[in-house]
């Protein structure tokens, strides 16, 4: 008789405890280390057991928090859903619902169009809307979520702060099946619907734009922030493009500690932080004359880099590409960039939330198409 692997035995035992209510929804499981000690097995074995539970949709793994029991459900699937396929399923409640919107921050380069689209779709759906900004602070995000729920909102759309750990309030909403949709930054391992861009594919395509034109020493520029899913995906896409060319992405040429564009620093330190970052970037550029191009993960970072290059007289020598761009009515682009479809992201997030408020508890991941918009010379004049 074939012997059942140890990790499957552990998985079966924990699964039975969950089904028999030994572990209830919201309970935290022992850590992988604790399980390995409890069952006298290796960490690898206990990790495989927990991964099986997660694959079954019995638990969710929250970085920095632990593994928690959730109501059994199918794991989310990545879908690309056109707007006209988001049809009504059930009527909304008799009284007009109000939804909450929690944003890290927003500006002309990214966020304003999305926010306007959310507001317009709320009107179409018969919703009221309440807006809260966290300004990059997790404590403000938590306070905002709690305040919105106390005020009785029917659901929440949230763009999480730059942090690899999720707030307890978000985990609580997932466990309680409170209607919530994340935008721009997905929460991996948490059963919450998401609407946003395929950042890895977009980053890969933008990096290939430079590689196709002969640039090989690209400086990757990102903010000083924990590796959120969005940043991780953009890094992965950048590296993948280099791998496809048989090249190595030299991380010694990367700038990874810019703070001025982060909402918390921008809000409270402003021009002082910007001056410090510009000084740091200029010093880095002078130290690495071999750099032939710059890839910024945000438009505001690209602007800072371009300003530094211009001060050194290198703006014509080293092209700068980025994600997002300013909202220019005549479609002029200062940099070649990934143009995200903010309007579609905004409207689809409201439609998904409306479905959840009506009772649809299927977790969806909706990837909205993007395109590469090339720089227009007139914008540089």
Please place each PLM-identified region on the residue numbering:
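Periplasmic-binding protein-like
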Residues: 100, 153-160, 219-222, 288-298, ...
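Hydrophobic alpha-helical segments within soluble ligand-binding/sensing domains
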Residues: 193-220, 236, 240, 274-282, ...
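Flexible loop/turn connectors
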Residues: 13, 17, 282-381
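HTH-adjacent hinge/linker in prokaryotic transcriptional regulators
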Residues: 51-129
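Extreme N-terminal segment that seeds HTH/winged-HTH DNA-binding domains in transcriptional regulators
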Residues: 1-40, 76-87
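Flexible loop/hinge segments that line or gate small-molecule binding clefts
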Residues: 159-204, 300, 324-335
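N-terminal helix-turn-helix
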Residues: 27-61
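An alpha-beta-alpha
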Residues: 206-248, 362-379
């Amino acid at each position: 008789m074939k012997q059942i692997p140890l990790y499957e035995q552990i998985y079966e035992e924990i699964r039975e405890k969950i089904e028999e209510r030994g572990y209830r929804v919201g309970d935290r499981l022992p850590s992988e280390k604790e399980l390995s000690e409890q069952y006298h097995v290796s960490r690898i074995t206990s990790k495989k057991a927990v991964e099986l539970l997660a694959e079954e949709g019995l638990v969710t793994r929250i970085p920095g928090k632990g593994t928690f029991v959730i109501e059994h459900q199918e794991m989310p699937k990545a879908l690309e859903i056109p707007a006209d396929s988001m049809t009504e399923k059930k009527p909304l409640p008799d009284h007009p619902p109000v939804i909450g919107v929690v944003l890290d921050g927003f500006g002309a380069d990214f966020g304003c169009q999305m926010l306007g689209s959310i507001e317009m779709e709320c009107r179409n759906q018969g919703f009221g809307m309440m807006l809260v900004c966290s300004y990059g602070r997790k404590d403000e995000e938590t306070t905002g979520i709690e305040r919105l729920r106390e005020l009785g909102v029917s659901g929440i759309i949230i763009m999480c702060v730059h942090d690899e750990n999720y707030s307890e309030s978000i985990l609580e909403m997932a466990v309680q099946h409170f209607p919530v949709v994340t935008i721009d930054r997905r929460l991996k391992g948490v059963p919450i619907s998401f609407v946003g861009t395929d950042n890895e594919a977009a980053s890969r395509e933008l990096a290939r734009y430079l590689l196709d034109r002969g640039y090989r020493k690209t400086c990757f520029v990102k903010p000083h922030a924990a590796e959120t899913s969005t940043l991780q995906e953009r890094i992965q896409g950048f590296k993948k493009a280099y791998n496809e060319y048989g090249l190595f992405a030299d991380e010694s040429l990367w700038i990874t500690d810019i703070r001025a564009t982060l909402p918390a620093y921008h809000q409270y330190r402003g021009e002082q932080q910007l001056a410090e970052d510009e000084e740091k970037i200029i010093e880095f550029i002078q130290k690495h004359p071999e750099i032939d191009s710059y890839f910024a993960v945000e438009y505001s970072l690209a602007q800072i880099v371009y300003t530094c290059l211009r001060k050194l007289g290198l703006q014509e020598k080293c092209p700068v590409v980025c994600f997002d761009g300013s909202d220019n009515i005549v479609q002029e682009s200062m940099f070649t960039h990934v143009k995200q479809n903010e309007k579609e992201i905004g409207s689809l997030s409201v439609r998904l939330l409306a479905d959840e408020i009506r009772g649809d508890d299927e977790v969806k991941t909706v990837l909205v198409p993007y395109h590469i918009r090339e720089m227009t010379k007139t914008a540089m004049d």
